[in-house]
Structure formats: C-alpha cells, structure tokens
Amino acid sequence: MRSAIRWAVVGLLIALAPGIARPAGPTLTVFAAADLAFAFDELVPRFERVAGAKVTLVLGSTGNLATQIEHGAPADVFFAADQAFVDRLIAQQVLIAGSRALYAQGRLALATAKRLGPKLTDLQALLDPRIRHVAIANPEHAPYGRRAEEALRAAGIWEMLESKLVYGENIRHTLQFVQSGAAEAGLVALAIANVPEVEWVLIDASLHSPLNQATAVVRWSPRPELGVRFIQFVNGPEGRAIMKRHGFLLPGEF
C-alpha cells in the first residue's frame, strides 16, 4: 500500500510540475533500469509524439524495481537490465509472458575521473594506490553490480579491492560517485558513461556473464496495448537507432 501511494504521489508531482509540456492522452508508467536514463531521455519524447500518450519514467536498480512491482507498484511496463528478473516475474504471473521481448545487451565500462590524469586501461590498474575508492552498483539488487563483481573476481582482484569498494544504489548513482570525486574510478554501464567528468574503456565481456536486457507488460496494467506499443517502438527502427547511439548491442547482434 505504501509503495502504491508513494508512486502515485511521484506521478502527481510530475504531472503538476510547471513548465513541462506533455501531450494529452493516456499515461504509461514505465519502470526502467537506470542504465536506460540517457537513451530513454531521448526516446520517450519521440514515442509520446507518435503515440499521443504521456510516459512517466521511473528509473532505479532492476532488483529494487522488480520488488516494487511484486508489491503492487502501479507500473505498466518493466524494462530490466537482466532478463532473469523479467523471467522471474513472468513465472510469478506478475508480467504478461506474451509481451516479453529482449531489447538490448548492456556493456560494462571502466570509468576514470578525469581529474586523476590518464585514464585507467584495465582492471589491474585499480590496484594503483592513487585509487582510494572504486564504485560499483550494489550486487545484491543491481545487475551491473553483479557483473562488476564477476569481472573483478575473474581478474583475480576482488579480495584486494574490497576495502576500496563503494556501492551505488543503481548504476546512475554509481557513476555519480566518479563524477563527484567520491570515487576515483568505477565500473559503470557504457550507456551512461559519456559524461564530461569521466573517461572510460570497455571491460572485456568475457570476464562476466552477459547483460541481456528484457522487458514485459505488467499483468495489472490498465493499458497493456499501449505498453506493447512502447516495447515495439523501442525495438523498432527509431528506437533501435537511439539505443545503438547510446552504446547498447541490439537483438540480432548478440
């Protein structure tokens, strides 16, 4: 009940915010993994114009969003950073199985604060004494955090780095640690790594399990057809072009 009230208040505040021009029509509430922040910032307004609908976007870690949906949060569509969370909710009959679709594969990047000097080029460089803090998303509920842990373990440096680690609540929060100077480096989503304060290199994908990202419509959505239409837009020509520009691999490429 508290979750439902909280998200209702969030939606009301967004709707009443001054100076925000929003199209008339039905409202679609999309719960989306935080790595989609930049891509969906570009994609959502285009869908709103095409569909004549409004989209309320709620970003967070996939695990936390999944828990909120399980407890009845008023989401219409769930975009996860790891397909396992979608499949779990389908098995629980929380999401509609027939609406499930892969939409991207995420990529992990090593981000270095520009103020540190030359960017780090591999994970072993995190052992440099200049690196006092390394940011990763919380592996308990964030897929990028789990993959970061896998990569650091595969590189043989997890135990040596544990005392340096700081944990973001989601992958955007993790990047903010590096942007703000709270951490000298971090393992972040490539899709959000292009910010002025950091430099980045891709992490070898063989060091972690793939970040295959999936979506589905929530069973109690009052507008499932609009949810399916949004998924189709993301996976359509215009949506795919936007996702590609933001560093995602697309279905058919993995």
Locate each region found by the language model.
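Bacterial N-terminal signal peptides
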Residues: W7-A17
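Positively charged n-region of N-terminal signal peptides that target proteins for export
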Residues: M1-R6
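Exported/periplasmic ABC-transporter solute-binding proteins
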Residues: I20-A73, A80-Q83, D87-I96, A101-F254
